[in-house]
Amino acid sequence: MAAFSEMGVMPEIAQAVEEMDWLLPTDIQAESIPLILGGGDVLMAAETGSGKTGAFSIPVIQIVYETLKDQQEGKKGKTTIKTGASVLNKWQMNPYDRGSAFAIGSDGLCCQSREVKEWHGCRGTRGLLKGKHYYEVSCHDQGLCRVGWSTMQASLDLGTDKFGFGFGGTGKKSHNKQFDNYGEEFTMHDTIGCYLDIDKGHVKFSKNGKDLGLAFEIPAHIKNQALFPACVLKNAELKFNFGEEEFKFPPKDGFVALSKAPDNYIVKSQHTGNAQVSQTKFLPNAPKALIVEPSRELAEQTLNNVKQFKKYIDNPKLRELLIIGGVAARDQLSVLDNGVDIVVGTPGRLDDLVSTGKLNLSQVRFLVLDEADGLLSQGYSDFINRMHNQIPQITCDGKRLQVIVCSATLHSFDVKKLSEKIMHFPTWVDLKGEDSVPDTVHHVVVPVNPKTDKLWERLGKNHIRTDDVHAKDNTRPGANSPEMWSEAIKILKGEYAVRAIKEHKMDQAIIFCRTKIDCDNLEQYFMQQGGGPDKKGHQFSCVCLHGDRKPHERKQNLERFKKGDVRFLICTDVAARGIDIHGVPYVINVTLPDEKQNYVHRIGRVGRAERMGLAISLVATEKEKVWYHVCSNRGKGCYNTRLKEDGGCTIWYNEMQLLSEIEEHLNCTISQVEPDIKVPVDEFDGKVTYGQKRAAGGGNYKGHVDVLAPTVQELAALEKEAQTSFLHLGYLPNQLFRTF
């Protein structure tokens, strides 16, 4: 308890932590908790099982409680908040609605970005709902720019989504990431006129007074939304003229300057630099903290941690809510209506509730993105940006929005790019470092070579069902085609998985498959061996965990595996990410992961807490044709076996290349064993029992000491010499002075 209290954690949380037998904070907790309590944005990386959830949950719970306590006691905060409302009383570019490298002059009209690699944009302080309007932009240098109109929902990167319309210096018009030729190029000293006819739904532009014609027709889905003047720059400078000064090229045909627009046509920006809701106004559906997880299992796990940490917090009590798919929305809405302080959820259902206004983000103080690399790899970057844009950057009590990003791979390009966009000078806490395999993990590769192992020919039809990638191909023995070898690999992998279980008498293991259909097929094959979900204690008892299983089934399957009711958990990478399963003695990789970092994540699940573990990877020596769905339904009902480059949903998977990349990443050569999967015992005293703790006595410590002994002796001699010299120097000065 004292260890956590020394970091500033309140006694009520420290007491709950102590009851969980957390005597000391983990490294990631010791580094991150004080930083978050201090009000900073934090990027953290640590291994699964390192206490990462506690590292962000504990300070988030404490600050949410303190905020609610201040509100309860009527405290307004120590800082007087400067309002940005005065900015909205005139037409100018909005300092509260711009990119991080976008500068605005004191007049609010001269704009500049000197970032040469990235685009940075800005919107105006006011928008329009009706009428015919016009403004001018003058180019001050030869940098790149796009100017035009966008709604409040649009990205600041003008023209890259369906809510903005841009015209660029390269002579292209842009909308929804579609760049088409329009008008002509423009550069320094040119003046671009931006026309908006909301009544007709038309957008057009002019160059130095020359009408370039119709550029866009405004789609129906945004006709009732206000459109704001907008631009995006890359190493460029512009100056806007909304009509306060005389236009260089006055508009015709009834278009009027923005500054002359009637008040009933105008909508002010929502971005004012303040929280959108006053401190005293209570909104039951407006949480103080939002934690986003990539999977429902991880969300449930995090919510359980939050419940444990807040156990002794009272007056006011904290109210938490889990928002995930597969649960009746009306139940979640009922809890929201009664008030909620902390929300933990997955992107799909969160997006639904936010977009319909059921979940209000106007009072969010904390935004936590757990397993951010997983969220980005699943394609949720747009959702994250949209959500972040709706959260006020400064709360009504003068506190800044805190963003916490947790990722297994902080140094990935996507995570870096995200952090630069949504975080404010974040502190990096990277305790993971370079990927490496723990000493408690023995990992080996089993080559799956259909050319030397002809078992697949002899099995006939008594083999695992394959994924139907080759349903239309000739894969009979003797075809000698890539398709035949690929099908043979799929059959052999099923046999090798069974062989590995029998050879090592596995009593518990996680088995990773590449796709959901592979998981289903392996589960079915284990059922043919007499096992399956309902065969408790059987050698091949197993359950499946992947996105196509119903939520209650996934939860039930995970619990059954944890309790030991079944021996094997067959799952995909996405489903297993971050799940709190400790000390599993075995892992089988039926297929190597697409990303080399995931190899370390997989095998890192064995051998925890000083328990030895064995990870076996089945690696095909020939290329295997596998599913790679790019279709809109993400594989459901898809039978398009053509290659991706031919418009299909398959690719050739080269596991030998992937193995090479993994070995280069880990800077080691992974041992290979024969197809009989007999693993040589060469650890410690030659007696290794996987799943058991290392034998006491130091293992190979003696050999380590023998190697270091000469160096230690040399250091001891140097230490003795240094101390002797110091003692002599104590008398030497007096002797020197006597001489003179």
Swiss-Prot record:
GO terms for molecular function: ATP binding; ATP hydrolysis activity; chromatin binding; DNA binding; DNA/RNA helicase activity; double-stranded RNA binding; exonuclease activity; nuclease activity. It is found in: Nucleus; Cytoplasm, Cytosol; Cytoplasm; Cytoplasmic granule. Residues 70-247 form the B30.2/SPRY domain. This is ATP-dependent RNA helicase DDX1. Residues 1-525 are annotated as: Necessary for interaction with RELA. Belongs to the DEAD box helicase family. DDX1 subfamily. Its main location: nucleus. There is a cross-link at residue 281 (Glycyl lysine isopeptide (Lys-Gly) (interchain with G-Cter in SUMO2)). The gene is Ddx1. Phosphorylated by ATM kinase; phosphorylation is increased in response to ionizing radiation (IR). Acts as an ATP-dependent RNA helicase, able to unwind both RNA-RNA and RNA-DNA duplexes. Possesses 5' single-stranded RNA overhang nuclease activity. Possesses ATPase activity on various RNA, but not DNA polynucleotides. May play a role in RNA clearance at DNA double-strand breaks (DSBs), thereby facilitating the template-guided repair of transcriptionally active regions of the genome. Together with RELA, acts as a coactivator to enhance NF-kappa-B-mediated transcriptional activation. Acts as a positive transcriptional regulator of cyclin CCND2 expression. A motif (DEAD box) lies at residues 370-373. Residues 1-448 are annotated as: Interaction with dsRNA.
